[in-house]
């Protein structure tokens, strides 16, 4: 089994992810996506948009503003209730999220337990019972558990006063809810229908960590799917299965994921069903996707605070009701990291070894690499590159032996290496090498585009 350290080292060495502000000593838990990382992440986002917006007869897209009227967050409950349980170590002054500290301590003992949803007293009792220690200094002396609001606060305009106070959004969902009527009317949508968007969110996490898994600045891919009350659990099951199948269609293995239903004590007060799709990272199981039936909570809250009517009139029955909502919420950074971890392999060959990223071709940063066998063949190889680059991200590499170039492309997940050799000048054909099998076939240059188009389908 590979370690998280191996994945992080490859990510930096090969230009997937760099530490943020590195030349100034960095900024804790900030990361910059490098040339290959942004291609991978963009491909993940494109694949999500294709499945959940483009190919869906129900759903449309939106791009709501990051900065919203502060009343939005009062209505949604974020100002009063968007908190994590915080605790400080009395000895080393390290600050921790109490529920995660307890879960990690229990996990080390082989005890699986969800602490989220317990009272502070119950958490404190668990800490004493299991002698939970500070991971930084091993002390068992902690302050009392207290609430910590996760929203980033800033000011709009030239003066810093409470009247100009605004927040960086902690989720993209509220931008969808406040635009429910705008979208429904302008697009003439009838229930059921959904609104999806991809965008940045910000949470002042107490203990971010595990590379890009938990960061204070992150990107979400969220769908809010509105339906008639009473049909919500049917749609909940539909979207839960659709989400799982999307991951499988892009090469994630069944063994590396699990669906975990929330028990009654863990459910949010507004939810009647929630399932987390979790991935087995090298550091343990972590949530990728939360699929929740949110009932009519959000639309009703915004109705109360804005005096806007979000009732829907059914054109067939003339019934009037506030729609229920199913929310599949996916972290773009988390699922990108999951695909990177799932693809990573160190393979032992007969007389050699190689590191390979077995990405689905749809996700791979480069779909192919053009490799002239000799620099004397660069002109012809460049023509092949130029033609394919109109439709695909392709690499061009003429440095080093062909074997070393193959290994470099394996390590960044390029599914196909296209070698332009001396015969190519005459027969207008190239050798195509498959990353996973390492098998090679001869193919006319004229067929390359169709070949790659077929391979990147999912």
Swiss-Prot record:
It catalyses: tRNA(Gly) + glycine + ATP = glycyl-tRNA(Gly) + AMP + diphosphate. It is found in: Cytoplasm. Substrate binds at residues 97, 171, 218-222, 327-331. One of its GO terms (cellular component) is cytoplasm. InterPro entries: aa-tRNA-synt_IIb, aa-tRNA-synth_II, aa-tRNA-synth_II/BPL/LPL, Anticodon-bd, Anticodon-bd_dom_sf, Gly-tRNA_synthase/POLG2, Gly_tRNA_ligase_bac, GlyRS-like_core. PROSITE patterns: AA_TRNA_LIGASE_II. Catalyzes the attachment of glycine to tRNA(Gly). Belongs to the class-II aminoacyl-tRNA synthetase family. This is Glycine--tRNA ligase. It comes from Bacillus thuringiensis subsp. konkukian (strain 97-27).
């Amino acid at each position: 089994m590979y370690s998280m350290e191996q994945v992080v080292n490859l990510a930096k060495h090969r230009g997937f992810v760099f530490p943020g502000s590195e030349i100034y000593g960095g900024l804790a838990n900030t990361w910059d996506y490098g040339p290959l990382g942004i291609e991978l992440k963009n491909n993940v986002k494109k694949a999500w948009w294709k499945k959940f917006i483009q190919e869906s007869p129900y759903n449309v897209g939106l791009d709501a503003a990051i900065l919203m009227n502060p009343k939005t967050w009062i209505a949604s409950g974020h100002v009063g209730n968007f908190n994590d349980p915080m605790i400080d170590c009395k000895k080393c002054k390290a600050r921790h999220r109490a529920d995660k500290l307890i879960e990690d301590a229990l996990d080390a003992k082989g005890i699986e337990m969800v602490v989220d949803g317990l009272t502070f007293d119950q958490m404190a009792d668990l800490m004493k019972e299991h002698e939970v220690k500070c991971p930084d200094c091993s002390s068992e002396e902690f302050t009392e558990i207290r609430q910590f609001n996760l929203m980033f606060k800033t000011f709009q305009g030239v003066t810093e006063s409470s009247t100009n106070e605004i927040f960086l959004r902690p989720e993209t969902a509220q931008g969808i809810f406040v635009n429910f009527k705008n979208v429904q009317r302008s697009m003439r949508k009838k229930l059921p229908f959904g609104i999806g968007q991809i965008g940045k969110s910000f949470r002042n996490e107490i203990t971010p960590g595990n590379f890009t898994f938990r960061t204070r600045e992150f990107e979400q891919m969220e769908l809010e799917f509105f339906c008639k009350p009473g049909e919500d659990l049917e749609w909940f099951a539909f979207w839960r299965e659709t989400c799982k199948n999307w991951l499988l269609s892009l090469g994630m293995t069944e063994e590396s994921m699990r669906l975990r239903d929330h028990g009654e004590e863990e459910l949010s007060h507004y939810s009647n069903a929630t399932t987390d799709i979790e991935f087995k990272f090298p550091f343990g199981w972590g949530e990728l996707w939360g699929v929740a039936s949110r009932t009519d909570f959000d639309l009703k809250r915004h109705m109360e605070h804005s005096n806007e009517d979000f009732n829907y009139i059914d054109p067939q029955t003339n019934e009037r009701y506030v729609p229920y909502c199913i929310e599949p919420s996916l972290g773009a950074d988390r699922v990108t990291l999951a695909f990177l971890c799932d693809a990573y392999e160190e393979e032992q060959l007969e007389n050699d070894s190689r590191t390979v990223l077995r990405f689905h071709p749809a996700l791979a940063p480069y779909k192919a690499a053009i490799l002239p066998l000799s620099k004397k063949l660069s002109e012809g190889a460049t023509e092949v590159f130029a033609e394919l680059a109109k439709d695909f991200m392709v690499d061009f590499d003429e440095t080093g032996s062909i074997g070393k170039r193959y290994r470099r492309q394996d390590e960044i997940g390029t599914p196909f290496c296209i070698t332009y050799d001396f015969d190519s000048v005459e027969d207008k054909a190239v050798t195509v090498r498959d990353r996973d099998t390492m098998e090679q076939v001869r193919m006319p240059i004229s067929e390359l585009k169709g070949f790659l188009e077929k391979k990147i389908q999912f």
